[in-house]
């Protein structure tokens, strides 16, 4: 027997797609009640207007949930501590998807809904990220993905549907790019960007100045970390949200944090994207420098070997997984002594190290110096080298010089 769905919680963005989903869901599920869930991730939009639009589109309720601080502390700071970059380039701004799914589920359970819905298309990664998280958090909820089932196939058809249902459609040219924005990044896809042979146009960037338009003087920033987490900027302790906003502004005006990449989507295709993440780029650089000072060689190398695994987990939306929990436990141990201060210069798209110190620094000048010292006995190296190279020596003897061609 088909399950009767009377109430649906919809992850709502305010765009054309999720706006027409409200009447569509009510039509296709016997006039079910639709509750819109809007997450404030620092996307710098008029969220009150978006809430009103949801209600005008037919939602019975619309929640606006401020998750900026939670996003920073529970998602972005673990990401910084991990040092993970997807395919060594992508700063993983879509880490917001599991958080959106989490809030959607929380409200769904509070409102006792039968199902949840999202606006991700059937060609992208987000459908996987949302649905993986929902199934992990509330497997009893039914998931509705209209883009995979409805007959609307184009923007023009969506506009016709919207007008037929009294949904306001702004009379403006279609944006040339598809964008996603939160406090961590802005992504740009589509339009001319779909062709990797074409240079990025000047009109793409919103948060970052083109290098040709950056100041001719460098700017110094100082970041303090405690157990791998950024806590202060230029000597001033700031909330996570304020720190990110301030650093985005400072680094953005110097043209820092722009990535033009072709990435492998989870669903099998390659896609080109432009990503702006000024604060993220600076934080990653500073954190990496501090780790080089505070972690042992074996710990640092093991952590680096796991970074792509962590990046894959985030990219694929497997935030709520046992594997991710286990990796977090390891990373947290590595960060116990990643405390200190890093000084950087920002100039013409470059992040230049300008000094760092930590009470837990493993760098000892008396050992590393090229001058005469009374600490390191260079004769000790001979025995180490003999043992370290013993297997190579034996192999060469057995194989009469070895064959390494």
From Swiss-Prot:
- Residues involved in L-citrulline binding: 90, 125, 129, 178, 187, 263, 275
Q: Does the keyword Nucleus feature in the UniProt annotation? A: no
* Stored HAMAP family: Arg_succ_synth_type1 (MF_00005)
Please list the residues that bind L-aspartate.
Answer: 121, 125-126
Q: What is its EC number?
A: 6.3.4.5
Q: Does the keyword Membrane apply?
A: no
Full protein name? Argininosuccinate synthase
Q: Which reaction does it catalyse?
A: L-citrulline + L-aspartate + ATP = 2-(N(omega)-L-arginino)succinate + AMP + diphosphate + H(+)
Checking NCBIfam families in the record gives: argG, PRK00509.1
Residues engaged in binding ATP: 11-19, 119
Name the gene for this chain.
argG
Give the source species: Legionella pneumophila subsp. pneumophila (strain Philadelphia 1 / ATCC 33152 / DSM 7513)
- Give the quaternary structure: Homotetramer.
